[in-house]
Swiss-Prot record:
The keyword Transmembrane applies. Belongs to the plectrovirus ORF1 family. It comes from Spiroplasma virus SpV1-R8A2 B. This is Uncharacterized protein ORF1. The lineage of its organism: Viruses, Monodnaviria, Loebvirae, Hofneiviricota, Faserviricetes. GO terms for cellular component: host cell membrane; membrane. Keywords: Host membrane, Membrane, Transmembrane, Transmembrane helix. Disulfide bonds: none annotated. It comes from the Viruses.
Length: 715
C-alpha cells in the first residue's frame, strides 16, 4: 500500500512538474506573443533587436507595473537583452515622444539671420540708426528692446502688446529697457547752471557764425571755453539751442536744417520708415525670442556651432492649496543633440514662480571621450534650512548614460489632468500635452554616486548631496495636492443633461482599469474610456512643436451592468460603495469620461483602481478600517480537476496569509511610502511576477514546497 502511495505521489509530482511550468509559461507569455495587432518595427541597428523593442515599447500591462523597480518602462535598459546607450536614436525618440514638452531647432530662422547679416545696410535703409544704435553683439535683445521702446513712444499698441505676450522679460515689467536717442538728448535752458556745475558729458549746440547765414551744429564735451562762447552767441541772437547727452558712450551728431536750425532727425518721415521695418520684421523677431527662450542659441556669428536640436523636458510642481500665494516651480532639462543624434550638451535648472526657496543650475558638455561629460553644478537657497544654508558649487566628470537612466527611471509619474471643460465643450480632439510632473521624492532617494567618474568618497558624497538638494521638495505636495485631483468626497451636482467629467492620463502612461468604484446615491451614470494615441511631434516653422491625439478603443459602459457592492452588512450601508467590472484591454486607456444621464442628479466618483491616495491614510485605517480592501477574492473551481483554479487559490492564500507577501504591491512600487495603488489584486499579481523573475521564482517555489509537504504527509 505504501509503495502504491509512493508511486502515486511520484506520478502526481511528475504530472505537476510538467503541468505547472506549462501553465505558468502560458500565463506569462510576452505581450508581443499574444494575439494583438502591433505595428512591427524594423531593427534599429543600435544594439537592440525587434523583440526587445516591442517588449520595451508595448509591454505596459498595468499601472503599478510602471512603478516596479525591475520595470523597463521608464528605463528601457532593464528589459532589453543589451545595454542601451544614451545616444541610441530610438531611445532619444522614445523620451522625446513620450515625455518631452517641446523640441527646438537650434538654428535661427533664415529671415532673422539675414537681418543680422545685413544689419549695416538695413539700419540705414530703414533709418533705425536715427533712433537707436542696435548692437550686434547682443543683437536679438537689443533689437527687441528698440522695437518695444519705439512702439511705446509712438503709441504702436498692437506691437507692444505682442512683445509683452511673447517675450518673457516683458511679461512682468512693461517698462521699456532702453531709451531712444531723442530721449537721451536733454534741452538745457538754464545756462548759469551749466557754468556752475561742470560735468564731463557730451553736448551739442546749434548756432551760426556772424559771417554766415546758415545754422551749424557742433558736438563737444563740457569745458569752460564753450561756456563762454555760448554766452556771446546768445547776446548776438546767433544761438538756437543747447542739448546734453544722458546716454552711454559717444553719441552721433544729429542732423539739422541749415536754413532753419531745426533738428531733422526723428521726424515723421524717419518714423514712418522705422514703422515699415517693424511691420516687416516683428513676426521673425518674436519667433526668434521664443526659440531662444526655449533653449536655442543666440550665437549668430556661429549658427552651426551648437547642436541642431534641443529636446526640452519641463517638470512642474504646483502647490494650489495656498490660494493667497500659489507656488509654482518648473524644473527644466534640455538635451542638445547634434545632426548625428548624439547628445553633446545639456542642462537641468530650476525656475521658481512666487517661490524663491531654492534655485540651481546643473550643466554638462561632452568631452569627446564617449559617454564622459564634464559637468558644473551650483545650488543656492535663500532660506535658512537644516539641509541647505549656503551656496554650493561642484564640478567634475560623470557618465551621462548612467545619469539619464537614473534620472528618467525615478523622475516620471503619471499625471491625471482634469479635462472637464475641454470634454464638456466638445474639445476632446484638441487636448494639449501639458507640463510633465516629476517625482522628486524618488529622485531625492536616488543614489547618484555611481555616475561620478572619481573614486574619492568625499567628492561622491558631495555630488550626491548636490543632486539630492536639487530634488528637494515639500511632502505637502504629494499628500495634499495630488489628492485634489481624486478627492474621495468629491460631490458634483449635475445642472443639465449629459453633464460630463473627464480626465487625461499624461506623461506617456496608460491605465489598465479592471474595476470602477462609485457611490450608490445617483440614479443614472455612464462612463467612457478612450485610448488616446499621441502623434509624433510636428513642427511649426522650426520654432516649436505640438502634439495631436488620435482617439480609438472608445468604450461605452452602462454603470449598472456587471456591478455590485464592494462590502456587505454594515459596511454596505456605511459606504454605499459599488463596483463595476470593466473589460480588460491590453493596450490601455488614458482618457476617462464620467457622464450623468439625469438632470440635477448628484454623483460621487471614487476613480478607477489606479487611485492616487495618501498611503499612510489608507494603511492607518482611513477609508476602510477593516483592511478588507486588500484581501484577494478566491476563485471558484469548475471542479476537482480545475488545477488552474486550485493553483490560483493557493497563491491567493499565500498573499492573504503569509506575512510580507501580502505587501507584494509595495515591493512593486518604486514610490512605496508615498503612493499605494488600489487594485483588483488577484488580476495583477501575475503581471507583477512577469516583470520580477526573482519574486516569481520565490512564490512558485513556496507553492511547490507546500504541495510537496502535503504529499509527504500522505506518504
Amino acid at each position: 500500500m505504501k509503495k502504491s502511495l509512493s508511486l502515486f505521489a511520484i506520478f502526481i509530482l511528475t504530472f505537476l512538474g510538467l503541468v505547472i511550468p506549462f501553465i505558468t509559461l502560458t500565463a506569462f507569455r510576452p505581450l508581443n506573443e499574444e494575439q494583438y495587432t502591433l505595428k512591427q518595427e524594423s531593427s534599429t541597428g543600435k544594439g537592440i533587436n525587434e523583440t526587445d523593442f516591442i517588449n520595451t515599447m508595448f509591454l505596459r500591462s498595468s499601472f503599478f507595473e510602471n512603478w516596479s523597480e525591475t520595470n523597463y518602462f521608464i528605463n528601457p535598459t532593464l528589459k532589453t537583452s543589451k545595454n542601451l546607450l544614451f545616444n541610441d536614436k530610438w531611445y532619444l525618440d522614445f523620451l522625446q515622444d513620450s515625455y518631452s514638452t517641446g523640441v527646438v531647432y537650434d538654428k535661427p530662422g533664415e529671415i532673422f539671420l539675414n537681418y543680422y547679416r545685413q544689419w549695416h545696410s538695413l539700419k540705414n535703409k530703414y533709418m533705425v540708426e536715427k533712433f537707436y544704435d542696435v548692437k550686434k553683439e547682443n543683437f536679438l535683445n537689443d533689437l527687441t528692446d528698440f522695437i518695444y521702446a519705439f512702439a511705446v513712444k509712438y503709441k504702436m499698441f498692437d506691437v507692444s502688446k505682442e512683445i509683452v505676450e511673447n517675450v518673457d522679460r516683458y511679461k512682468e515689467n512693461h517698462y521699456p529697457r532702453v531709451k531712444l536717442k531723442q530721449d537721451n538728448w536733454k534741452l538745457i535752458t538754464d545756462y548759469n547752471w551749466l557754468k556752475d556745475n561742470f560735468d564731463n558729458k557730451y553736448y551739442f549746440v546749434i548756432w551760426k557764425q556772424s559771417y554766415s547765414k546758415e545754422w551749424e551744429i557742433m558736438k563737444f564735451k563740457h569745458n569752460m571755453r564753450y561756456d563762454m562762447k555760448i554766452e556771446s552767441y546768445i547776446k548776438n541772437n546767433s544761438f538756437k539751442g543747447l542739448y546734453r547727452w544722458d546716454g552711454d558712450g559717444e553719441p552721433q551728431t544729429p542732423t539739422i536744417d541749415k536754413n532753419t536750425g531745426e533738428i531733422t532727425d526723428w521726424n515723421s518721415y524717419q518714423q514712418s520708415r522705422v514703422k515699415q521695418f517693424i511691420d516687416l520684421s516683428l513676426y521673425s523677431v518674436l519667433q526668434e525670442n521664443i526659440r531662444v527662450q526655449q533653449g536655442g542659441s543666440a550665437d549668430y556669428e556661429n549658427p552651426n556651432k551648437v547642436g541642431t536640436k534641443r529636446i526640452i523636458f519641463d517638470f512642474e510642481t504646483v502647490d494650489e492649496l495656498d490660494v493667497k500665494n500659489i507656488k509654482k516651480a518648473i524644473y527644466r532639462m534640455i538635451l542638445t543633440v547634434d545632426e548625428a543624434n548624439l547628445i553633446i550638451s545639456g542642462s537641468l535648472e530650476l525656475n521658481n514662480i512666487n517661490n524663491d526657496d531654492l534655485s540651481f543650475n546643473f550643466s554638462f558638455m561632452r568631452t569627446g571621450m564617449g559617454e564622459v561629460f564634464n559637468f558644473n553644478g551650483s545650488i543656492y537657497s535663500s532660506l535658512n534650512s537644516k539641509d541647505l544654508k549656503y551656496y554650493q558649487q561642484f564640478s567634475g566628470q560623470f557618465d551621462l548614460s548612467k545619469f539619464l537612466q537614473s534620472f528618467f527611471a525615478s523622475a516620471l509619474v503619471p499625471v491625471f489632468q482634469n479635462r472637464s471643460l475641454f470634454i464638456e465643450n466638445g474639445y476632446i480632439d484638441n487636448l494639449q500635452y501639458d507640463t510633465v510632473l516629476v517625482n522628486f521624492f524618488a529622485l531625492k532617494l536616488q543614489n547618484f554616486n555611481n555616475i561620478l567618474l572619481i573614486e574619492n568618497i568625499n567628492d561622491k558624497l558631495q555630488f550626491d548631496k548636490l543632486l539630492n538638494s536639487m530634488f528637494k521638495i515639500s511632502q505637502k505636495f504629494y499628500t495634499n495636492y495630488l489628492r485634489t485631483i481624486f478627492d474621495l468626497e468629491n460631490n458634483t451636482y449635475v445642472q443639465g443633461y449629459n453633464k460630463k467629467y473627464g480626465l487625461l492620463v499624461n506623461n506617456g502612461f496608460k491605465i489598465y482599469p479592471r474595476y470602477f468604484y462609485f457611490s450608490d446615491k445617483y440614479k443614472q451614470l455612464d462612463i467612457k474610456l478612450y485610448s488616446a494615441f499621441k502623434n509624433r511631434f510636428y513642427t511649426i516653422n522650426n520654432y516649436g512643436s505640438v502634439f495631436n491625439y488620435d482617439f480609438s478603443v472608445a468604450n461605452n459602459y452602462n454603470i449598472k451592468l456587471n456591478s455590485g457592492y464592494v462590502f456587505g452588512g454594515d459596511l454596505q450601508n456605511k459606504y454605499g460603495l459599488q463596483y463595476k467590472k470593466i473589460e480588460e484591454q491590453k493596450i490601455g486607456y488614458n482618457v476617462f469620461e464620467l457622464q450623468a444621464q439625469k438632470e440635477n442628479d448628484m454623483y460621487r466618483y471614487y476613480d478607477f483602481n489606479f487611485g492616487i491616495y495618501n498611503w499612510q491614510e489608507i494603511n492607518n485605517g482611513g477609508l476602510f478600517p477593516d483592511k478588507q480592501w486588500w484581501q484577494v477574492q478566491y476563485v471558484t473551481p469548475k471542479g476537482w480537476w480545475d488545477f488552474g483554479a486550485h493553483i490560483k487559490n493557493a497563491v491567493i492564500w499565500i498573499v492573504n496569509t503569509i506575512p510580507g507577501v501580502k505587501q507584494v504591491n509595495e515591493l512593486a512600487s518604486g514610490v512605496g511610502k508615498v503612493f499605494e495603488t488600489v487594485y483588483s489584486f488577484f488580476s495583477q499579481i501575475f503581471e507583477v511576477w512577469k516583470f520580477n523573475p526573482a519574486l516569481y521564482s520565490t512564490i512558485t517555489n513556496i507553492f511547490l514546497l507546500i504541495i510537496f509537504m502535503k504529499f509527504v504527509r500522505l506518504i
